[in-house]
Amino acid sequence: MRIGFGLDVHKLVENRKLILGGVEIPHDKGLLGHSDADVLIHAIMDAICGALCLGDIGKLFPDTDMKYKDIDSRVLLRKVFEIMDDMGYEIGNIDSTISCQKPKLRDYIDKMRENIAQDLHTNTFNISVKATTTEQLGFEGRCEGITANSVCILNKKDL
């Protein structure tokens, strides 16, 4: 068994789509980044990479490489799955928290869990996604950005 932790933060800006867990969320701002800036999927990928001692996602998918410009983060998550699978591991479980003041995410969480479970070839029971606010404190509370944290347990596959 291996444990990994991931964290990602992106700034909210106008004229960008807000994508979390592969779900487009109606909002007046989106997250700024080289890819689609999906902080939830980025935190999950970092957790998996950490558990496998691969470094962070910037090492695997550098923002200096134009082939990752505006890429769908689910494509990258599937690549991380392939690496994990090739190394002989599978998802035990993932627990993630998204921190933002707005928008409210409750109605989108089930679809996020489904997307992530599909890309990681696991059951949705193994994928937890929660959302919270910072009670209007800090940059999340001022609606300047969104943070996601994730922890994962990977199990060695039975051969």
Swiss-Prot record:
The family database entries (CDD domains) matched by this protein are listed as:
MECDP_synthase (cd00554)
Q: Which keywords has UniProt assigned to this entry?
A: Isoprene biosynthesis, Lyase, Metal-binding
Catalytic activity entry? 4-CDP-2-C-methyl-D-erythritol 2-phosphate = 2-C-methyl-D-erythritol 2,4-cyclic diphosphate + CMP
**Chloroplast recorded as keyword:** no
Annotated residues for binding of a divalent metal cation: 8, 10, 42
Note the site residues: Transition state stabilizer.
34, 133
Q: Which GO terms describe its biological process?
A: isopentenyl diphosphate biosynthetic process, methylerythritol 4-phosphate pathway; terpenoid biosynthetic process
Q: Which Pfam families match?
A: YgbB (PF02542)
- What cofactors does the UniProt entry give for this protein? a divalent metal cation
Q: How is the cofactor bound?
A: Binds 1 divalent metal cation per subunit.
Q: Name one GO molecular function term.
A: 2-C-methyl-D-erythritol 2,4-cyclodiphosphate synthase activity
Superkingdom of the source species: Bacteria
**Protein role:** Involved in the biosynthesis of isopentenyl diphosphate (IPP) and dimethylallyl diphosphate (DMAPP), two major building blocks of isoprenoid compounds. Catalyzes the conversion of 4-diphosphocytidyl-2-C-methyl-D-erythritol 2-phosphate (CDP-ME2P) to 2-C-methyl-D-erythritol 2,4-cyclodiphosphate (ME-CPP) with a corresponding release of cytidine 5-monophosphate (CMP).
Entries under HAMAP family matching the protein: IspF
The annotated subunit structure for this chain is: Homotrimer.
Query: What's this protein's family per the entry?
Result: Belongs to the IspF family.
Q: What is this protein called?
A: 2-C-methyl-D-erythritol 2,4-cyclodiphosphate synthase
Gene encoding the protein? ispF
